[in-house]
Each structure stands twice: as C-alpha cells, then as structure tokens.
A protein has these predicted regions:
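Amphipathic alpha-helical elements of HEAT/ARM-like alpha-solenoid repeat scaffolds that form extended
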Residues: 75, 135-143, 176-190, 218-234, ...
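Acidic, glycine/GT-rich loop-and beta-edge segments that sit at the periphery of enzyme/chaperone cores
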Residues: 1-48, 234-240, 253-301, 305, ...
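Charge-rich, solvent-exposed alpha-helical interaction surfaces
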Residues: 117, 121, 136-140, 144, ...
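Acidic low-complexity intrinsically disordered segments
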Residues: 1-195, 293-296, 418-422
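Surface-exposed polar/charged interaction patches
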Residues: 121-128, 143-151, 162-173, 187-190, ...
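Long, leucine/valine-rich, helix-dominated scaffolding and oligomerization segments
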Residues: 134, 138, 152-225, 236-269, ...
Length: 422
C-alpha cells in the first residue's frame, strides 16, 4: 500500500470524500476527486500523540480501513516499521465531547421513513415522481415527523445532510429545484448552532456560483435568496460579500414604472431581506445598503419589508454578526430622524425599525444620543407599541423570543437562541 509521513504531537486534518458513482475503485488507487460523483465528508481533525518527551516528529505510516461489527467505519494509521503501533482516526461527528448535545436525530423513530421520502424525490435512481408529489414532500415529512416548527436541531441537520447529498439532483425540474431550496434553507437555518455547521455551510456555498437552473421562474428566485438568508448566520465575510455583490447587480437593474421586469425581480422582497441579513460584511457596505433602502423608502409604493430591512441594517445589536460591523451611531442617527418623520400608524413596520436602531446597548460607541432615544420612547408609547420595544430603547437588554423571531424573519429551531454579540 501507499505510505505517508504522519506528524505526531501536532494538530492534523484529514479531508475525506465518498463516491456516489458506479466506478468500483480499488483500495490504494489514486483518483482525481472531481465532479458530481464525489461528496465531501466531515474532515477528521485530531492530534495523534507522540511518545512522552519525544516532541513533534514524523513517522511513516499506511492507512487501513475496516468495517466494524456494528457497521461503522474505523480508520487507523499503522506504523510501517512496527505494525503494532497504530493510531485510530476518530470522526468528529459530534463536535466537542465536553459540549452537551441534544439526543441524536437518529433516535427519532420516523427519521428513516423521512429520509426515504427525500430519496424518492431526489434519489439517484430515475423514478417517476410527478410535480404534485415533489411539491408534497414537505407535507409528507410533516406527517411523519410532526409540524416542522417542532423539528429540533439534530433532526433538522440530519434532513439537511440528506438533502445536501442529493444536491446535484435538485435540477430535475422547476418543482425539484424549488422544493430542494426551500427545505435545505429551512433545515440549515440559521446557519450555526450545531456541530459541523461550518462544514455544512462550506459545502452549501459551493453551490452559490451555480445559481439556479430555472431562471424564468420567479418563485425559484424567491427560494434561492431565502436559502441564503436562512443560512447567513454561518456564512463568513468573504461569502457574504460575494452574495452582496451579486444582489447589488440585480437590484441596480430593477425597472421603474411599467418596464418589463425580469423573473429575478419578482423576488425583490427576498433580495432586500437577504441584503439586510448579511451582518458579517464591513460597516462601509452596510452603510451603502442602508442609504439605498432609504432612497427606496421615499417611494410611496415601496414594500413594507424595506422598513424591516432598514431596522435590521441599522440595528445597534446584530443578531449574529460582530459589533465592529455595526453601522456607526452618527449615521444610524440620521436614518432614525427619517423614520421619526413618518406617520407610524400608517406605516407599522417603521416603529420596530426605530426600536432596533435606537436600542440601548451600554456601549457609548454604538448608542445614540439620549435625547434621540427619548424621542423614540415617546413615539413608541404614543403609537401603543409593545412594551418590549419601549424597554429595548429605554433600558436595553435582550430580545424576547417574539422580537427575535421578528428580527430574524421566522422562528429559530426549538431550543436555539441567538446570543447578543457584545
């Protein structure tokens, strides 16, 4: 077999792939792992111990793989000089063992049946599945697993992993693509919170450059942008900047008046919500997004989602982003003045936008002047806004579940809360 140099006493990482193709690869055969037949697996990251006092050193090893009696795969590095010396490569499928995790989704008694439903629609074999059956996949999953609002994080990620393994077959029809995008985004939201989410996000973002297949379908565009909004919490800055650049290109070509709209523009609301959800991009870019939103809001017929987006972009506390990407207080104050000039009874979302922009954090670099926040408190009280909104501006504190749901755009998985970033 092939030999490798293994570094002991230092963190090492092994990238694994599996093949879903029909080629019978032989053990030890060198293969170019390219194309849709290869699927990236979770990497093995570990430190293989050296003998006491030996420090870091290289040893020549060969890889062995065996299937255990219970059907799991074990991999060892075996010393070429002394076969009795071997190191088990542990698959880090549960994250840090010191971090308590909910019970595995495999314990859900109906999960195998749910995975079979996903396989029927997106499986490798060519099955006669009509459009109605594809559309009904989510309903069938809910009949098996209960209402989707109750699906916990391990179950959601098990479903996402099954969908991701079959991502290459999402393009069979417009219905396939739309259904896959909807379910993949829902089961990965908010893009963080579970072991291996970083790896899942990395795999998912590999699809971004491909775009959608059925570009004449406005509903497919809507699901496409919603997918990335739902996953945005786990997307790194570089990925978010790439998404924002593509979004800007589409939004800049938005037609005025009665000019013909492209199908992508049918998903305008979803594009706006996604742009506001990209909290990892530098503040300079978020300022540009906010300015563009304010310009759009000068139009009498502008959608209400744009007010939600302005509040999210100007928020003093990001849902998952870093504090250094928050829009500077002096700029946010200017936005808030524009919001205060409105009739909140006529434009209900403006009140929540104001509460987010004026929220007290206790950080002088982020907080707006007291007089401006007092004005917001009075306006919120006069418009009979929820007490929780008034408290955010007057006293600060954490978002309640309902307000976090409103900020995120939908409910988070059961048991998961986004903690405010200091």
């Amino acid at each position: 077999g092939r030999s490798f140099a293994l570094r002991l006493g230092q963190a090492v990482r092994f990238q694994l792939v599996s093949s879903v193709g029909d080629t019978p690869w032989q053990a030890g055969e060198l293969v170019e792992a390219q194309g849709d037949d290869f699927v990236r697996l979770p990497p093995i990251a570990t430190v293989l111990p050296a003998a006491e006092g030996a420090g870091r050193r290289d040893v020549v090893v060969q890889l062995t793989a065996t299937m255990t009696e219970v059907g799991t795969l074990e991999m060892h590095c075996v010393s070429a000089d002394d076969p009795a010396r071997r190191w088990l490569l542990a698959f880090q499928l549960r994250g840090d063992a010191t971090s308590p995790e909910p019970p595995s989704a495999a314990e859900h008694p109906r999960l195998p049946a749910a995975l079979a439903e996903i396989e029927r629609v997106f499986g490798g074999q060519s099955k006669q599945v009509d459009a109605r059956e594809v559309r009904g996949l989510r309903a069938r999953l809910e009949r098996l697993l209960g209402p989707r609002e109750g699906w916990d994080l391990p179950l959601l990620r098990a479903l996402f992993d099954a969908l991701m393994e079959r991502a290459g077959r999402r393009r069979r029809s417009a219905e396939h693509e739309r259904t896959w995008l909807n379910l993949a985004g829902y089961t990965l939201r908010p893009g963080l919170g579970a072991a291996l989410d970083e790896w899942r996000i990395e795999r998912l973002f590999g699809l971004f450059g491909q775009g959608i297949q059925y570009q004449q379908e406005g509903r497919n565009w809507s699901e496409w942008w919603t997918l990335w909004r739902r996953a945005a919490g786990g997307l790194p800055e570089a990925a978010q900047l790439e998404i924002l650049e593509v979004l800007a290109g589409h939004l800049e070509t938005l037609p005025d008046g009665k000019r013909a709209r492209a199908p992508v523009h049918d998903a305008y609301d979803d594009m706006v919500r996604l742009a506001a959800s990209l909290e990892q991009v530098p503040a300079l870019h978020r300022i540009e997004v906010g300015k563009w939103l304010l310009e759009r809001l000068q139009r009498p017929a502008e959608k209400m989602h744009t007010w939600w987006a302005l509040g999210r972009v100007g928020a003093r506390r990001p849902l998952y982003g870093s504090a250094h990407t928050v829009v500077p207080a002096e700029i946010a104050a200017g936005w808030l003045e524009a919001v205060l000039a409105l009739d909140w009874k006529r434009i209900e979302p403006a009140a929540f936008a104001a509460a987010q922009i004026a929220r007290l954090t206790g950080d002088r670099s982020l907080d707006l002047p007291d007089a401006l926040r007092d004005s917001v408190v009075r306006r919120l009280a006069a418009s009979r806004a929820p007490e929780s909104w008034i408290a955010l501006v007057r006293d600060g504190g954490r978002l309640g579940d309902a307000d976090q749901r409103r900020s995120f755009g939908e409910a988070l998985p059961p048991g998961l809360r986004l903690i405010d970033v200091a």
